[in-house]
Swiss-Prot record:
Binds to muscle nicotinic acetylcholine receptor (nAChR) and inhibit acetylcholine from binding to the receptor, thereby impairing neuromuscular transmission. It comes from Hydrophis schistosus. GO terms for cellular component: extracellular region. This is Short neurotoxin 1. GO terms for molecular function: acetylcholine receptor inhibitor activity; ion channel regulator activity; toxin activity. Transmembrane segments: none annotated. Keywords: Acetylcholine receptor inhibiting toxin, Disulfide bond, Ion channel impairing toxin, Neurotoxin, Postsynaptic neurotoxin, Secreted, Toxin. The keyword Lyase does not apply. Expressed by the venom gland. Disulfide bonds join C3-C22, C17-C39, C41-C52, C53-C58.
Amino acid sequence: MTCCNQQSSQPKTTTNCAESSCYKKTWSDHRGTRIERGCGCPQVKPGIKLECCHTNECNN
């Protein structure tokens, strides 16, 4: 499976993953809206939006 792994608004980069899902976490801090992407579907703290998906590069 191929997932995107760039941070926030960086140019798109991808990684090959052993997991069968990709995630996109979104939250806000003093620098504005932050976005993290990667493999799997992690647990997140309250206040963090998590989207998980199951197709290649679906978390862009």
